[in-house]
Amino acid sequence: MKVMDKRRFLMAGGALLAGAAAGLAGCGESEPRSNGATTPAGAVEKPNLKLGFIKLTDMAPLAIAKEKGFFLEEGLNVALEPQANWKVLLDGVIGGQLDAAHMLAGQPIAATIGLGTKADLIAPLSLDLNGNAITVSNRIWAQISPNLPKGVDGKPLHPISAAVLKPVVERFRSEGRPLKFGMVFPVSTHNYELRYWLAAGGIHPGFYLPRDVAGTTGADIQLSVTPPPQMPATLEAGTIEGYSVGEPWNQAAVKKKIGVPLIADHDIWPRNPEKVLGMTRAFAETYPATTTALIRALIKAQQWLDADQGANRPEAVQILARSNYVGADADVIAASMTGRFTYAPGDVRPAPEFNIFFGSFAGYPFASDAVWQLTQMRRWGQIAEDRPDAWYLETAQAVYRADLYLAAARALVAEGVIPAESVPETDGFKEVQTGFIDGVAYDGRAPNAYLAKFAIGLKQGQRVAASGVSPA
């Protein structure tokens, strides 16, 4: 199988979307690929595993590894168990009720440094890149859409800056109430992307303090936690006026005609890390062969998802639509997973990189991606005081375990399962990234210099305490 070429995938996207929406339930009858590249029988120390997940499109590698037989090829009998929210999922892994899980990219990092429940967690595999969007209610859309720059086709020009919300923020403030948005968890990429987008548009999302775990100190807008599947209903009820979430819950708002996605996260930070495979360090050390087998199976699933110019995506849509996985309508899942993204009825745009599972080294747990998560924790006060660059780098490398990923991936290369060029030759730090919506360049080797570039956020020398934010 060839790794997905994004241009060819884009060309095929319309046909894939139509096929998925038409209900191609029968297109997934092919047998799991067998090539002799498996974990030797009896090698795994713990063959029966329970993995947790949240009902989101990006749990796809877990579902595909099970449904296409990749777990079984590696000697694993895996039960996939949906969790009510990210806190329940995290507690399940820490408490041992779950062996591993589909986790937010920031969860293992936050637990390791003691944000919330302290635990020694690791991420030996990145599950995907991109996959989120920010949606607003029809009420907010009606207020901002007339003022948006339009293209020759009459559709809004993208990306849309958060600055368009400034008049809305002021209107709510004049009425004595805050503009409220939802996000999925305090240490989620969704939270940090939403905050980044707001701050880039001149809107302060607030600081976290020991007495303000909601992170609203100094905020122009109020952010609160809502579990992903509950986002559309919470928006429809008027409890929130917008949210940052993964799919299919932005597309669900479009289908229900209750909201409009303003921006996809690849327009905030291209190829950003989204979910990881999370587990305790103790699990990986106690069951090393099992951990390797688990990573191998998921890499195979990631390759399947991005292979042959996206040809497998319609089948993946049908699998994810099942009630034991995401449980959303297939056409809603397909609206973001097959090379295009629906912003509004009649506004469907090419989005070949909305979900990346295997291409662009999506599985490799880059330390620089973990450092970025840490910088945002510091920027908004979850990390109370300055830390040296070395602390950021050492923490990132201790949690994002590229060594475990490489052991599994290089074996798959040697066996001819994945191409050698799909595994990066790297020290774990990407080159300086310049594609952020605000144009600020990010060098993962220099986190403090990066933090100093922002107009909104904690400054060098500032710290947070119960009494508030100290001056720099």
Question: What are these language model-derived features?
Answer:
Residues 1-18:
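N-terminal secretory signal peptides and thylakoid transit peptides that target proteins
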Residues 19, 150-189, 193, 293-339:
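Ligand-binding clefts/hinges and TM-proximal coupling segments of bilobed small-molecule sensing domains
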Residues 27-35:
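Bacterial lipoprotein signal-peptidase II cleavage site
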Residues 36-224, 236-237, 241-254, 258-271:
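Short, glycine-/small- and polar/acidic-enriched structural segments
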Residues 134-135, 276-279, 283-284:
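Short glycine- and hydrophobic/aromatic-rich loop-to-beta-strand nucleating segment
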Residues 286-403:
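Secondary-structure end/capping motifs
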Residues 371-472:
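Conserved C-terminal helix/tail region of periplasmic/extracytoplasmic solute-binding proteins
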